[in-house]
Amino acid sequence: MPTINQLIANGREPAAKRNKVPALQGCPQKRGVCTRVYTVTPKKPNSALRKVAKVRLTNGYEVVSYIPGEGHNLQEHSVVLIRGGRVKDLPGVRYHILRGVLDTQGLAKRRQRRSLYGAKRPK
């Protein structure tokens, strides 16, 4: 326990903030190539087959990214753009793939929250 005089002289060091998306290196998005596209099962109270892809980024990192929406056209060697954002019931999945960018098609039938899924405006 420091004395008051020690605190006045040196102060306290603030706790370092942990980076939740280290592979992005401060960038809003990063480009990468899918090395594997597969499904995983979520944590305990939930049950599903969630679609994920292992992506090798341009900076050399290899990360697991979630593929949002119903249905996708991704396969090995597809070029994708990823953003930060974890999936709460999939441990180790801390990134999302952006729909409607590069090799990833947007959703056709989407009416609401279209910008998240790369969907065109319906006529």
UniProtKB/Swiss-Prot annotation:
Coiled-coil stretches: none
Residue numbers carrying 3-methylthioaspartic acid: 89
Keyword Ribosomal protein: yes
Keywords, in A-Z order: Methylation, Ribonucleoprotein, Ribosomal protein, RNA-binding, rRNA-binding, tRNA-binding
Tagged with keyword tRNA-binding: yes
InterPro entries xrefs: NA-bd_OB-fold (IPR012340), Ribosomal_uS12 (IPR006032), Ribosomal_uS12_bac (IPR005679)
GO cellular component, one term: small ribosomal subunit
Gene3D superfamilies from the UniProt entry: Nucleic acid-binding proteins
NCBIfam families linked: rpsL_bact
Functional description taken from the UniProt entry: With S4 and S5 plays an important role in translational accuracy.
UniProt similarity note: Belongs to the universal ribosomal protein uS12 family.
Protein name according to UniProt: Small ribosomal subunit protein uS12
Origin species: Gluconobacter oxydans (strain 621H) (Gluconobacter suboxydans)
Lineage of the species this protein comes from: Bacteria, Pseudomonadati, Pseudomonadota, Alphaproteobacteria, Acetobacterales
Gene: rpsL
